[in-house]
Regions:
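Hydrophobic, lipid-facing positions within transmembrane beta-strands of outer-membrane proteins
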Residues: 24-29, 75-79, 103-107, 145-149, ...
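Transmembrane beta-barrel strands of outer-membrane/channel proteins
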Residues: 4-10, 42-44, 94-98, 120-124, ...
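Gram-negative outer-membrane beta-barrel proteins
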Residues: 10-16, 48-52, 87, 100-102, ...
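Signature for the C-terminal beta-barrel architecture of outer-membrane proteins
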Residues: 1-2, 34-37, 66-207
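Outer membrane beta-barrel
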Residues: 1-90, 111-112, 264
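Outer membrane beta-barrel transmembrane domains
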Residues: 120-127, 133-135, 195, 200-249
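Outer-membrane beta-barrel "beta-signal"
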Residues: 81, 248, 253-261, 278-294
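Outer-membrane beta-barrel translocator domains and adjoining extracellular loop/strand segments
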Residues: 14-22, 53-59, 103-106, 130-138, ...
């Protein structure tokens, strides 16, 4: 069978009278052929894999944020092939076009057995530009090769791990995420998720170690409402980030009330040129988001 998608995104974000973001671009355009054992997709698409939800070691080609009610992610211009030779085995291959007109390529194998679900991923990128990888915005200098393994076990408690090595001619990044989730029998079920990330970034003659901890709790209230809370901590810098959202979802629209408590702007030990000029994203914030689906 053959299908396709074409969609546009137009976005303007304001903070007071300051324009923070203005985007008007294609969001997706792709053509796909698929059958029971094979899928080929070509065009601007999303490529997402891995088991983590908050501290995502394998966020190589996407910008998914679990705190974003829209759930959109940036795409890549790529040819992606997937094979399904067995019900518990799949193979991915891709070629991605970068913004500086170079081609990167890679692949992934996924399989499951009695002790869990496994994934093995490889990718190489010859681009010489500085690249930002994962939800923590790790910087990689120069062309690089990436190796990763991820695992998930679903039992009484869900457990998962993502581990990756990103090696370039100027830097070496080793990242690991450990996570677990459990549903408490409270009301309709309180889902608790905790993740820990350890990251070591070696570039030139310097080494930087970072550690992060994240906790997410969510509970549905009937079939319409849901409350979600996320707290993250940068352990080395002792900074806390808190997020609370009440969502109400109806047939054609949803309403989201969001409260954030982030460190104040004055607590960051960075030059002003590395911080955006608006106060949005610092201190305490309140947001109301209306989403219409048609």
């Amino acid at each position: 069978m053959i299908d396709s998608e074409l969609s546009l995104r137009w976005m303007r974000n304001y903070s007071g009278d300051s324009l923070l973001l203005h985007e008007q671009e294609f969001y997706r355009y792709w053509l796909r052929y698929y059958n029971e054992n094979f899928e080929a997709r070509f065009g601007l698409q999303k490529i997402v894999f891995g088991t983590s939800q908050l501290l995502r070691t394998l966020s190589w080609f996407d910008s998914i944020d679990p705190m974003d009610p829209i759930g959109q992610t940036s795409g890549v211009k790529a040819l992606r092939l997937r094979w399904f030779p067995m019900h518990n085995l799949s193979s991915w291959n891709w070629i991605i076009a970068s913004k500086d007109d170079t081609l990167s390529y890679g692949g992934r194998i996924e399989f499951s057995n009695t002790i869990g679900e496994w994934g093995f991923t490889y990718h190489t990128d010859p681009s010489k530009s500085i690249k930002s990888i994962s939800s923590i915005n790790t910087s990689v200098l120069g062309s690089d090769s990436r190796f990763a393994i991820d695992y998930r076990f679903d039992g009484l408690i869900g457990l998962w791990n993502e581990s990756a090595l990103i090696q370039s001619n100027r830097s070496k990044v080793v990242t690991m995420t450990l996570g677990a989730d459990y549903t408490l029998p409270i009301s309709t079920g309180l889902l608790l998720t905790v993740e820990y990330m350890s990251m070591q970034n070696q570039f030139d003659y310097a080494t930087r170690d970072s550690k992060f901890l994240a906790l997410m709790a969510s509970i549905p209230l009937g079939i319409t409402h849901q409350i979600m809370m996320v707290s993250q901590m940068n352990i080395g810098e002792e900074k806390l980030y808190h997020f609370l959202r009440w969502s109400s979802t109806y047939n054609y629209y949803s309403l989201n009330f969001i409260c954030t408590i982030y460190p104040k702007r004055s607590s960051y030990q960075y030059h002003d040129q590395f911080l955006h000029q608006s106060l949005a994203g610092f201190g305490t914030g309140l947001q109301v988001m209306f989403i219409y689906n048609h």
